[in-house]
Swiss-Prot record:
Role, per record: Catalyzes the conversion of S-adenosyl-L-methionine (SAM) to carboxy-S-adenosyl-L-methionine (Cx-SAM).
Sites where the protein binds S-adenosyl-L-methionine: 40, 65-67, 116-117, 131, 194
HAMAP family, alphabetized: Cx_SAM_synthase (MF_01589)
Lineage top rank: taxon: Bacteria
PANTHER family in the cross-refs: CARBOXY-S-ADENOSYL-L-METHIONINE SYNTHASE, TRANS-ACONITATE 2-METHYLTRANSFERASE-RELATED
Annotated catalysed reactions: prephenate + S-adenosyl-L-methionine = carboxy-S-adenosyl-L-methionine + 3-phenylpyruvate + H2O
Gene: cmoA
Subunit structure: Homodimer.
A biological-process GO annotation: tRNA wobble uridine modification
Name listed for the protein in its UniProt record: Carboxy-S-adenosyl-L-methionine synthase
InterPro entries for the chain: CmoA, Methyltransf_25, SAM-dependent_MTases_sf
Organism expressing this protein natively: Dichelobacter nodosus (strain VCS1703A)
Length: 237
């Protein structure tokens, strides 16, 4: 994939603006996400493992909000070679980088689209993945998006959903900041990134996430990952 760098976006004092998934973010995103989400590599591995127990020959899969394709590439390791993945993101910088990688690696079973998932028509799919994306969707649009995903899934299909949630205890927030500090982020960088995300990332409680999934019609919602406030569920149609 294109060259990546260590995340130092918020290292220096600055007039903080709203967080954007632009080229500056895309250039450091792999480093940023692994240093920000505890056990992120384990989450990617497990979603691939779980999807592999569902996906059959010729099935279709979506990775909605794919960024640089971490989930897509994990899926590819565990699904049949005849399955097809459509990876979607609204960030031109993310799409350009991931599409260049897919084409360079001749991964013909992966299609990379630049689109707004709120408005994108979804075709029938066995598995849909959405990792840390719903939290960036305007809250009034979330119910309709989950309902659309439910309708697109085949009977018995699954949504693999991961989100940062409101902490049940303030200790979790303290521990998460300690984790980021252990990854080399300064107190200034942590504070400035928090400020940048304040208006664009609206997190909810785990209960709210579950209620939305159940209201859409999912018959079972099972947890499969937790790293402090970062949680993931399998929602089964």
């Amino acid at each position: 994939m294109n060259e990546f760098f260590r995340d130092d976006i918020f290292n220096r004092p600055q007039n903080v603006v709203d967080f954007r998934f632009d080229e500056r973010t895309a250039a450091v995103f792999p480093d940023m996400i692994h240093r920000s989400i505890p056990a992120y590599a384990s989450l990617l591995h497990m979603l691939g493992v779980i999807a592999g127990t569902y996906v059959q020959e010729g099935d279709h899969i979506y990775d909605l909000g794919c960024s640089l394709g971490g989930a897509t590439l994990s899926l590819s390791r565990f699904i049949p070679k005849t399955a097809h993945i459509t990876a979607v993101d609204s960030s031109p910088a993310m799409v350009q980088r991931f599409r260049a990688y897919v084409e360079g690696a001749a991964l013909h079973h992966i299609e990379v689209l630049e689109a707004d998932i709120i408005h994108l028509p979804l075709k029938s799919s066995r598995v849909i993945v959405m990792n840390f994306v719903l939290q960036f969707i305007p809250p009034p649009a979330r119910d309709a998006l989950i309902a659309k995903i439910y309708q697109a899934l085949t009977e018995g299909g699954i949504l693999l959903l991961a989100e940062k949630t409101q902490p049940e205890d303030d200790l979790l927030r303290t521990w998460h900041e300690a984790f980021k500090a252990s990854q080399g982020y300064s107190a200034l960088a942590i504070a400035q990134k928090r400020e940048a995300l304040e208006n664009v990332m609206k997190i909810e409680t785990e209960t709210a996430e579950r209620v939305r999934l159940q209201a859409a019609g999912f018959r079972r919602v099972l947890p499969y990952f937790q790293g402090m406030m970062f949680k993931a569920w399998v929602a089964i149609k």
